């Protein structure tokens, strides 16, 4: 049974069309990073991220009620809604000149919650598949090498601990996705990988490279991630009977 919304809900083509536009805007933002003033770029990037997250949350909420309360839509709506709130708080603090206090902070819990809730949506929407335990262990070890190295170099602090949590949650999301046939759904798979990459780079930027402007490319990557994820949920998977 496709995970699209039935005829009485939001037309699938409208939802996917909106997020194809967001994806195109994300691509356009990449070269804009070299042209626009850093503050202008940051504002444009964050407004688009907020818009994509908020519209995604609304689309998933309506889809939840219009599709017989399928649970994966609720998990996805929660993920996008919490992320939008967290990013709004992040940008307000940066706008007020409080960039130094946004990492680590409670705001990070919203970004991490996105990964937890998205993993929950995958568990409901996608059929479970067997993954070689060595692959899962390899992913975990590979992704935790960097934060562990940071622990060894800088010690255990609030910042290094938060960095570890970002990498751990990213590894967990990828492993859970792979164990629920995520590779068979290229839009969802690509969106998930982009989000994980963005939010492994994010703590590294905050801890090690706060002055490097080109790392603001995280913004377009997140917009692309959201776009692919929404398109994937409305086009690709077949929900489990229990959903």
Describe the predicted segments one by one:
Residues 2-243:
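Polytopic alpha-helical membrane-helix bundles and their juxtamembrane interface segments
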């Amino acid at each position: 049974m496709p995970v699209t919304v039935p005829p009485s809900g939001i037309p699938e083509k409208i939802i996917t069309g909106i997020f194809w536009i967001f994806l195109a805007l994300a691509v356009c933002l990449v070269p804009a990073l070299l042209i626009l003033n850093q503050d202008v770029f940051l504002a444009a990037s964050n407004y688009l991220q907020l818009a994509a997250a908020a519209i995604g949350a609304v689309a998933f909420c309506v889809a939840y009620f219009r599709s017989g309360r399928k649970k994966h839509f609720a998990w996805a709506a929660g993920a996008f809604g919490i992320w939008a709130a967290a990013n709004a708080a992040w940008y307000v603090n940066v706008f007020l000149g409080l960039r130094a206090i946004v990492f680590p902070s409670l705001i990070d819990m919203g970004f991490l919650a996105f990964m937890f809730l998205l993993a929950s949506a995958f568990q409901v929407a996608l059929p479970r598949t067997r993954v070689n335990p060595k692959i899962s262990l390899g992913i975990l070890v590979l992704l935790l090498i960097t934060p562990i190295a940071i622990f060894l170099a800088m010690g255990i602090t609030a910042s290094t601990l938060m960095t570890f949590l970002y990498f751990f949650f990213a590894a967990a999301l990828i492993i859970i996705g792979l164990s629920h046939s995520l590779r068979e759904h290229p839009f969802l798979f690509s969106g998930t990988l982009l989000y994980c990459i963005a939010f492994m780079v994010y703590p590294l930027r905050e801890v090690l490279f706060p002055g490097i402007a080109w790392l603001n490319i995280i913004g377009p990557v997140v917009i692309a991630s959201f776009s692919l994820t929404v398109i994937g949920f409305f086009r690709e998977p077949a929900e489990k009977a229990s959903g």
